[in-house]
Amino acid sequence: MATKKIAQTVITEDKFYTIAAANGKVVEVKDYNTENGAQIQLWDNANAEWQQWSFVRAGEGVYRIKNRFTGKMMDLDCSGVTDGTHVHQWEGANASSQLWIVEPANDGRVKIKSNLAGKCLDLVNMNTENGAVLQIWADVNGDNQYWTINEVTRKPKTSATNFSGVFVVNAV
């Protein structure tokens, strides 16, 4: 079991984490969609499996970021490397578009950078509202490029139902 010290957070391969923006909203798979290409977005933390991620070691300091609910990896759309390339999920593959580096900051936050593009995980138009889309962008040292990785310590809410656009989460 490999671990790596990241600021004040220790990432362990067999644990799950939330990835939170500065406002506390977390990275999730939109509408708990299990399909390849499903959008990755920001949303209020509901302690749901589609908001939880594991970091699978893929080399020294390099990880694949895997969604707990879907089992799919955080991935660059069409293996893009330019500013504005959206981040989505895709089945695990030996693809450089699924490799990420976690760089600690001195304040407990981290930057998550694409190993392929060298660009930061970023919020489109610096939007921090529910539904904000994730992309990669050159490192501009903005708050929209810093993340807090928190270990999940509570049992997640796992069952979800969608009735006519109303999202219901049932505690297990």
Tell me the role of every PLM-derived stretch.
Residues 2-34, 52-81, 99-128, 146-156, ...:
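Extracellular glycan-recognition/adhesion modules and their associated mucin-like linkers
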Residues 19, 39-40, 65, 85-87, ...:
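Generic preference for hydrophobic/aromatic residues in regular secondary structure cores
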Residues 41, 51, 88, 98, ...:
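Intrinsically disordered, low-complexity repeat/linker tracts enriched for polar/charged residues
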Residues 36-49, 84-93, 138-140:
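Surface-exposed turn/loop modules enriched in turn-prone residues
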